[in-house]
Amino acid sequence: MFNQALHLAVGLRFAAVAVLALGAGAVTADADYDLVINHGRVIDPESQLDAMRSLGIRQGKIVAISETPLRADRSIDASGLVVSPGFINLHSHSMAESGYRLELLDGVTTVLELEAGAFPIARHGRRLGEGPLTHFGASVGHAWIRMQVIDPEAIAEVARSGRIDMSGRAFTQPANQEEIDRIKMIMERELAGGGLGIGLLLDYMTRAVNDPERDMIFSMAARFGVPVFVHVRRGIDGDPAGLEEVLAVAERSGASLHICHLNASAMSGVDDWLDKIDAARARGVDVTTEMFPWTSGSAAISSDVFSRNWREIFAIDYGDVQWAETGEWLTEATFNTYRIERPDGQTMHHYIREDWNRRAISRPHVMVASDAMPLANYERKVVPNGAGTSTRVLGQYVREERLLTLSDAIARLSLLPAQRMEAFASAFRDKGRIQVGADADLVLFDAARVAARASYESPFLAPAGMEYVLVGGTVSVRDGALSDEAGAGIKLINSLGDD
């Protein structure tokens, strides 16, 4: 399959080069495009192209890049707009159309659930129906497989109600060797079924996952050639022990590693953590990381960390925690009541400092991901990450604070995530780029106006300045609103069996 796609891409590249060599007149008269985008400032972070160009799109692919306008029955005038590769979100818990809608309006064309993952992979995305708003995919969710093996009634309850009690046996009880072997068998089957790596929620299972189980996971990842996407075990502010643990296991096993939401885990130690990651990369460890540009964490109130010394860990108190769905600020009494009566409920614990975020995003190769929370409807509030992560970076860190160049920010939102995935999922070789033969996953935004409008008080507000979003060549957002055409997303799986 990959070889056929490669031949097609090469053919498209040569065809477009031949057409462009004839001059603008030949392109406008002879080329048959489904859609053209004219007069835009095209930024491709891989080739470093940053210039006025026009794009020709056919069958979901970019087939022409021209210095002069192109002509077709359908066109977009991108005057005054930046044309960028569609954004790839490696870390989102959006599991339903309502969440995907928010991310699409924020410029995300590929939504991936890689930290927690999914199980079974074959059923991931079925709730999205036949026309998903964005491309999507998931890693193999170790936690859910662990629940299947150790506490099957709990996973059945998740399937019935969607509610997860993280104080149950699967999140607190170490596995014996027989259980580890069963977890391994199911995980291998799920990787063979297309899982995009392995999702490992170590911090949520601090007491549960012992060294043999952890080492089994990393050894499997190395054998299959996929990364482990890990939420590291958490210590007090800045403690690097959780990072050092997974770096050592990755180096010993040869597994690829991705550290989720570094700013939220490292806290004031972001520089030290990134120095350790850079040192590991220099030794040959394949390790990457990400951050989100918000200042609150979000977790189920039954999470293991809230059974530990969480006030010392986060350096906050009960009054810094909100009940996510209503925005209620908690007291010790209401916190403990919710722990008993609503163990599935989400909190927003406000402990992240803007300074940590700025220090993280200023370092090379740190990607951006939303860590958006599950959202079945708009009746219950969640953190605003899903509605305003990409646009917050573009508005705040690029335009207002000038911490990043526009091209650098676009790379962290598109190219770098594609490069993290493409070694084991070949579909990503055509994403995160504006090049002939690349997928026509594109965003068009006004760099002078783009900004997140969502907030903790109003988490569902669509951003400003995000004018068009194309998914597979389909105009899915037009003039900042969902279009009638939206629904061109496809499921993405690994390509381990294609070679």
Region locations from a protein language model:
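Conserved short loop/turn motifs at secondary-structure junctions
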Residues: 91, 202-207, 232-237, 261-267, ...
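Flexible loop/turn segments at secondary-structure boundaries
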Residues: 95-96, 119-121, 144-148, 205-209, ...
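Metal-associated gating/positioning segment near the N- to mid-region
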Residues: 68-131
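Active-site microenvironment of metallo-dependent hydrolases
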Residues: 6, 10, 16-20, 25-53, ...
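Active-site neighborhoods of metal-dependent hydrolases
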Residues: 148-209, 247-251, 256-406
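Charged helix-capping and loop-helix junction motifs
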Residues: 211-216, 242-245
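Divalent metal-dependent hydrolysis catalytic cores, especially in the metallo-beta-lactamase
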Residues: 101-122, 133-144, 191-206, 224-233, ...
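Conserved beta-strand scaffold positions in the cores of enzyme catalytic domains, especially
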Residues: 36, 75-77, 87, 136-138, ...
